[in-house]
Amino acid sequence: MEKSEKGNGVAPATRSPMALMGSSRNENQEVNTSMRTAETMLRLVPMALGVAALVVMLKNSQSNDFGSVSYSDLGAFRYLVHANGICAGYSLLSAIIAAVPSPSTMPRAWTFFLLDQILTYVILGAAAVSTEVLYLANKGDSAITWSAACGTFAGFCHKATIAVVITFVAVICYAVLSLVSSYRLFTKFDAPVNYPSKTIEATVFHG
């Protein structure tokens, strides 16, 4: 009876290596699931922003006694529409891929890293050039004979400003995604190992 009681008292205090490995594996799976869910949501946010900016700009046109203007009249705004459409499509596709449980391989990490970087610069360029056009439309520039048009087409400029602001928010999301994909890629590489030079040490001792 004493042995059995001692045995019962010791058993809960000790855990087998297999049990420890199983618990750590479950914890890793929970962490991976949480990270996968967070990344999926982070990739869906710029998709929604891109669609919103695209729709606002597509519907942006105004007519009055002075004439009519549409987003298609300006190359910068056409670029903004195309860039938001491409980025929204990529965000949806990458979110679907990120949501699927699969091992993170080196080719996959490189693909996400490169595409996230490219799309970040694409959407940033669209937002920047559209901002310049909006500035000229508001302030004008006599040096290039560009007159201020927002006083005449205030509604058009207002919608264009909304689309550009939404695009800049999408740029922030893509910048965060670029950091995440960079981290996932470069953590797969081993840290450099410093090998001490025995020749130098020997020279120092003999000197």
UniProtKB/Swiss-Prot annotation:
Its main location: membrane. It is a multi-pass membrane protein. Pfam families: CASP_dom. Disulfide bonds: none annotated. One of its GO terms (biological process) is seed trichome differentiation. One of its GO terms (cellular component) is plasma membrane. Keywords: Cell membrane, Membrane, Transmembrane, Transmembrane helix. The chain crosses the membrane at residues 38-58, 80-100, 109-129, 160-180. Residues 1-30 are annotated as: Disordered. Residues 59-79, 130-159 are extracellular. Residues 1-37, 101-108, 181-207 are cytoplasmic. It is found in: Cell membrane. Homodimer and heterodimers. Belongs to the Casparian strip membrane proteins (CASP) family. This is CASP-like protein F16.
